[in-house]
Regions:
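Acidic-aromatic substrate-binding/catalytic surfaces of carbohydrate-active enzymes
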Residues: 2-86, 136-139, 143, 147-153, ...
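Low-complexity, acidic Ser/Thr/Pro/Gly-rich terminal tails and inter-domain linkers that flank the onset
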Residues: 83-103, 253-273
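Acidic (Asp/Glu-rich), glycine- and aromatic
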Residues: 88-92, 101-162, 343
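Low-complexity, Pro/Ser/Thr- and charge-rich linker/hinge segments at domain boundaries
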Residues: 136-140, 261, 266-281, 344-380
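Short Pro-Gly-centered flexible turn/kink motifs
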Residues: 235-253, 774-787
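Terminal, non-catalytic domain-edge segments
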Residues: 256-276, 532, 536, 540, ...
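Extended acidic/polar, glycine-enriched regions
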Residues: 290-358
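Catalytic cores of extracellular degradative/oxidative enzymes
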Residues: 354-624
């Protein structure tokens, strides 16, 4: 009987299966004994048929012939702290060398593709599985999903591809993976999962993503999409050529250390503004090792179906390079940096229209195109119709825009009509807020009620002369009644209702405002009831913070659980538990050289690593709440990174994805390219109904695959308008200025800061002395700072 072969150094331990894949990769001092690669044993135990996707397996198409690592038993040799795995296909040989002895504390992985013939071979597809432990375990012991699973944040680059596998607890150490030789095209993902949503069990979803590193191709023959940013080419392997790729794996504690260790491996350390507004200056800073210098930089963008370029100004001061330019076109911009050794790096930034215009166009589209009116089926609904409360988020966005921006009475009244004539009778028998309808066969979802409560609360914010069916005070009482139904287990008869009512949700966004208004209107009994229920819930969540019970929802691990928990605990000023859940948020929000890959980690709506507009935005909102309480700028920066990706779902000027009509929006952006489950969805925006044709649960959730792709959008933008929709932050870190949600220009005596907020109200200055609200200047869209440069 053969056994796995082991190599180790002082920090890492690795085992190679006799089949040639990495069966174990672990940190020696890890108290949780996490295996950083997906295990064949777990796949078998959970019933997943994916043993062909384990770390180190590969697929290659050479001269149109498909081969893979499972066809032959490899030759495996060990010498000291090095293992060599060789696959010999006759005309080609693939050699993988795993070396733990080159630099203590690191794994060095070399891949050789050798042409053994005296003629060229065309490689149209070559991908190697790098299946880090991106797993949502089917385990109600949520600590397993926190301490033994990782999010994977990747940066694809010509010569500097890297990723960080981030343990979900954000405390136990992460694994960085850096390219140090060769060129990778992309990292794709394959998703496998089990979803028992309709079987009335909770949690009902588990699954995993397998990551695949591509050196050639990745897509079906002849495949085309709108993505002009990333390569999909094959390459010619010359006669007797030995083409080589090298990677280094090491341990880091956080994002900063991940980037610093990259710098030591000659990776440029690039900081950039993920979201930019047309006409304002876009900025990057680049720190490099002593051996590198920047020769030039340019911004590539697509205009009228043609990729164009714009020169980027490069200055060197303060031991780093400062790059800046003013974009002249809307859409994605690929800023390419060329170095003195012939290598290249790049970042992908977005350039959007003014955001108040984006929101105005979106709200007009909702009211003009999606509102069904009296003759609709059902009457007064907004398309697309759904039983899930998330579908009402667009109504809340309409109301919020009309509270902060220009008032359109007709828009408000359409929403009011829908709330009274469609929402109330659909979700509640005879409109009685104590009698929820079982819209899902034999159960209802308590989570639906938090969106309805918010809807009624926002209606209560309008003057009575704007409303036409009921008074603002009536809507306030309705909001309180629905909120109580959402959080009071005693109002539910079945176990599912009692259990779900005690789960946190998006209502943390408006709970404080609701209480304040109830107090103002002297609705004392309702206020006290809700306050008491809230206090009980928060005490329970606070006491149970060590077990992280709130991280489980309908899914075995969910940012829709720990995000609201962190936000709500911050609202309740429970510092210790807010910090605990806050760590899960920091480990959940990505960082990358592509603004679209900085999303809060989530996969099930897209079957890929993705930006999910609703829960990306609500996770960003939760991080913002934590920042507001703890004053830790990591949460502020994470919240804004996530927000930039969410706004991409509303961007009708994007050029690298399927275009949208003015005012349209799409709930999901799949980060992966390729999306191996559905290559046609690679690096594109779409709604979940796109999976209808695949059958299974999606055929039960949706009526067809042409339903509008924005069914669950809106609540996240309502949350955005309460934070970055109005606020801009200026961070002075030892004389280096950074603006979150804005841009700056240098003046003779300081800086002029311009906000990107659609309804700019407040500028905050953050330095070693703390955070200060600056005095309002002019129209509130900009401030001048008189500080020494």
């Amino acid at each position: 009987m053969k056994h796995d072969i082991k190599i180790e150094n002082k920090s890492l331990e690795m085992m190679i299966s006799e089949k040639g894949y990495i069966s174990k990769l672990s940190m020696k001092d890890d108290p949780y004994k996490m295996n950083w690669v997906i295990e064949e044993a777990y796949l078998s135990q959970a019933g997943y048929q994916d043993a062909d996707k384990l770390f180190g397996y590969f697929d290659i198409t050479a001269d149109s012939k498909q081969r893979n690592s499972r066809e032959f038993s490899p030759v495996i040799e060990k010498e000291g702290a090095e293992i060599t795995v060789t696959y010999d296909f006759g005309n080609m040989k693939i050699i993988m060398i795993y070396d733990m002895g080159k630099n203590d504390g690191e794994l060095h992985w070399t891949i050789h593709l050798v042409n053994q013939e005296k003629k060229d071979i065309w490689i149209s597809d070559f991908g190697v599985w790098i299946s880090f432990a991106y797993v949502m375990f089917r385990d109600k012991e949520v600590l397993r999903n926190i301490h033994n699973s990782a999010a994977v944040f990747s940066s694809i680059s010509d010569n500097y591809t890297k990723l960080n596998a981030v343990r979900r607890d954000n405390r136990g150490g992460n694994l960085g993976f850096y390219q140090v030789e060769g060129e990778a095209l992309s990292i794709g993902t394959y998703c496998d999962y089990e979803n028992l949503f309709f079987e009335n069990v909770s949690p009902s979803l588990d699954g995993m993503l397998f990551h695949k590193l591509y050196f050639a191709g990745g897509y079906p023959e002849g495949f085309q999409n709108k993505d002009w940013i990333y390569k999909k080419d094959g390459f010619m392997l010359k006669a007797e050529e030995d083409r080589t790729w090298k990677y280094v794996v090491n341990i880091n504690r956080n994002q900063e250390e991940f980037l610093e260790k990259g710098l030591k491996l000659n990776h440029p350390k690039v900081d950039y503004t993920p979201l930019n507004i047309i006409g304002e200056t876009a900025r990057l800073t680049v720190e490099v090792s002593e051996s590198l210098k920047i020769l030039s930089a340019e911004a590539l963008f697509k205009e009228n179906d043609t990729v164009k370029s714009l020169s980027i100004e490069v200055k060197y001061e303060g031991e780093m390079y400062h790059l800046s330019y003013k974009p002249t076109a809307l859409g994605e911009h690929k800023a390419v940096i060329k170095f003195s050794d012939g290598t290249k790096d790049f970042v992908v930034m977005n350039v959007m229209d003014k955001l108040d215009r984006v929101i105005d166009e979106r709200v007009a589209y909702i009211c003009d195109e999606l509102y069904e009116g009296k003759e609709g089926n059902p009457p007064f609904a907004f398309k697309p119709v759904s039983n899930q409360g998330e579908s009402l988020g667009k109504l809340n966005l309409v109301l919020k825009k009309n509270l902060l921006g220009s008032l359109d009475v007709d828009q408000v009244r359409k929403v009011e009509k829908s709330a009274v004539e469609y929402v109330r009778p659909k979700w509640f028998k005879d409109g009685d807020f104590k009698k929820p309808r079982k819209l899902y066969g034999d159960f209802y979802r308590c989570m639906d009620f938090e969106y309805i409560g918010h809807l009624f609360y926002l209606l209560s914010e309008f003057d009575d002369q704007i409303l036409e069916l009921y008074t603002a005070d009536t809507y306030l009482e309705w909001a309180a009644d629905v909120f109580e139904l959402r959080v009071n287990p005693d109002l539910h008869e079945d176990e599912r209702g009692k259990e779900e009512s005690q789960m946190l949700g998006v209502y943390f966004l408006y709970f404080e405002d609701l209480l304040i208004k109830l107090k103002e209107k002297e609705l004392t009994e309702k206020m006290q009831t809700i306050q008491s229920l809230w206090d009980k819930m928060m005490d329970r969540v606070h006491r149970g913070a060590d077990s992280y019970a709130a991280a489980i929802t309908e899914h075995f691990y969910d940012n829709a659980g720990f995000g609201p928990a962190a936000g709500a605990l911050s609202v309740s000023k429970k510092r210790e538990s807010a910090e605990k859940y806050g760590e899960l948020l920091l480990a959940n929000i990505g960082y990358s050289n592509d603004f679209r890959a900085q999303n809060p980690d989530r996969w099930w709506e897209a079957l890929s690593y993705m930006t999910h507009s609703l829960w990306g935005g609500l996770t960003a909102a939760a991080a913002y709440k934590v920042f507001s309480y703890l004053q830790n700028t990591e949460f502020l920066e994470g919240s804004y990174r996530a927000t930039a990706g969410v706004l991409y779902c509303y961007d009708t000027h994007a050029t690298a994805v399927t275009p949208l009509k003015k005012g349209m929006a799409v709930s999901t952006y799949a980060v992966a390219g390729p999306h191996i489950n559905r290559p046609d969805l690679s690096r594109d925006r779409f709604g979940q109904a796109a999976f209808y044709r695949d059958g299974g649960i999606f055929a039960r959730l949706f009526d067809s695959d042409d339903q509008t792709p924005d069914w669950d959008m809106g609540e996240e933008m309502t949350a955005y308008l309460d934070s970055f929709g109005q606020k801009t932050f200026i961070i002075n870190n030892k004389g280096t200025l950074r603006v979150i949600n804005g841009s700056y220009e240098e003046t003779e005596t300081g800086y002029k800061i311009t906000s990107f907020a659609p309804y700019s109200r407040d500028f905050y200055y953050i330095s070693e002395d703390g955070m200060t609200l600056l005095e309002r200047q002019g129209d509130g869209r900009s401030v001048v700072l008189q500080i020494r440069r």
